[in-house]
UniProtKB/Swiss-Prot annotation:
One of its GO terms (molecular function) is lipid binding. Residues 3-282 form the DegV domain. This is DegV domain-containing protein SpyM3_1667. It comes from Streptococcus pyogenes serotype M3 (strain ATCC BAA-595 / MGAS315). May bind long-chain fatty acids, such as palmitate, and may play a role in lipid transport or fatty acid metabolism.
């Protein structure tokens, strides 16, 4: 039986690619200067537009996908006897995953045999996107829903996410980083390198003076443990630094391909401009 793969706008997947690969995107929303912006569809807000507003002093807020939105999608699939695999934005960073679980319970009251599987990716941005790409490849190769789910869940503990943020104020403001860590990063051009740990929390792993040294440390962290030769690089604003990071990664003998994936508006709202991120699958668990 064929099945639908669905993920959030936080996966930062190109919408044309998603449509071509039969991936359903469901969007979080952004509130900025009294306006509510969509993050999927033809009227979605762009990251560049949002970042310009942030540079001008705006403080956007993001809203999780609510139960009703999930229920609508899940109910439609159940009514049409169509199986669905939903890869959710990290439960540590958003309540979206919990909303999906609640919606699933509501739908199963009327459709007890509905095939709806929900995976907490413990990931965001290119990491969530990476898992969705793997799921699409598995489905295209003939794997069924449960086999595809197993493949994704086996990779989650080995997915490594590294972030280099120019200004930690945005992460602190959104509650994604402690005030102490943010203050430390503001001292004397110290650039904390962050990663998502085994619990899905965003934590500093190194403190480096200067952006270029921090980028080199990011590459060094990636080189420690690589299982898949494909790496994803994401960025806001500074595409030039992202291209240099890509070149440094490609110089590694175990990396054959680096996908460039701009950070979408939801993640951009929390990290701000001049952010770099790398997503890689390691051999060992985090």
């Amino acid at each position: 039986m064929t099945f639908t793969i669905m993920t959030d706008s936080t996966a930062d997947l190109n919408q044309t690619w998603a449509e071509d690969h039969d991936i359903v995107l469901i969007g979080l929303t952004i509130l900025c200067d009294g306006e509510v912006y969509e993050t999927v569809g033809p009227n979605r807000i762009s990251s560049d537009y949002l970042l310009k507003k942030m540079k001008a002093g705006s403080h956007p807020q993001t809203s999780q996908i609510n139960v009703g939105e999930f229920e609508k999608v899940f109910r439609e699939h159940a009514r049409n006897n169509k199986a669905l695999l939903y890869l959710a934005f990290s439960s540590v960073l958003s309540g979206t995953y919990q909303s999906a679980l609640m919606a699933c319970d509501l739908v199963r009251e009327d459709y007890p045999d509905a095939v709806i599987e929900i995976v907490d990716t413990l990931a965001a941005a290119g990491g969530e996107g990476y898992l969705t790409i793997l799921a699409a490849e598995a489905r295209d190769s003939g794997k069924n829903l449960l086999e595809t789910k197993d493949i994704v869940e086996a990779v989650i503990p080995r997915l490594r996410t590294y972030f280099l943020v120019d200004d930690l104020f945005h992460l602190m403001r959104g509650g994604r980083l402690s005030k102490g860590s943010a203050f430390l990063g503001s001292l004397a051009s110290i650039k904390p390198l962050l990663w998502i740990d085994e619990e899905g929390k965003l934590v500093p792993i190194a403190k480096i003076r200067g952006r270029q040294k921090a980028i080199k440390e990011m590459v060094a962290q990636v080189e420690k443990d690589i299982a898949d030769s494909t790496v994803i690089v994401s960025y806001t604003s500074d595409q030039g630094s992202a291209e240099k990071l890509r070149e440094e990664l490609l110089a590694h003998e175990n990396i054959s391909d680096v996908l460039m994936m701009p950070l979408g508006p939801v993640i951009s709202a929390h990290v701000g401009p001049n952010t770099l991120a790398v997503f890689v699958i390691g051999q060992n668990s985090r």
